[in-house]
Amino acid sequence: MTAKTKQSWNKGIWENGKQGSHQQTFLPKIWVNIYSTPTS
């Protein structure tokens, strides 16, 4: 995953999290998993 792709993922996940209250507890967990995964 490139830095640009990662940035898009992060933005999309946060935006989606704002729109759905049931998603706010779920999506940040995915975001953390993606963010803490080392890129090669």
UniProtKB/Swiss-Prot annotation:
Task: Give the CC-aspect GO terms.
Answer: cytosol; peroxisomal matrix
- Keywords noted in UniProt: Cytoplasm, Peroxisome
The consequence of inactivating this gene is: Decreases the level of LYS1 protein.
Q: What is the lineage of its organism?
A: Eukaryota, Fungi, Dikarya, Ascomycota, Saccharomycotina
Could you confirm whether the keyword Glycoprotein appears in this record? no
Ranges for the region named Disordered are 1-20
Which segments show compositional bias classed as Polar residues?
1-10
| Name of this protein | Peroxisomal LYS1 stabilizing protein 1
Name its species: Saccharomyces cerevisiae (strain ATCC 204508 / S288c)
Output the GO biological process annotations, alphabetical, semicolon-separated.
Answer: regulation of lysine biosynthetic process via aminoadipic acid
- Report the function annotation for this chain: Modulates the lysine biosynthesis pathway, possibly by stabilizing the lysine biosynthesis LYS1 protein in lysine-deplete conditions.
Location (main, coarse): cytoplasm
Localization recorded for this chain is: Cytoplasm, Cytosol; Peroxisome matrix
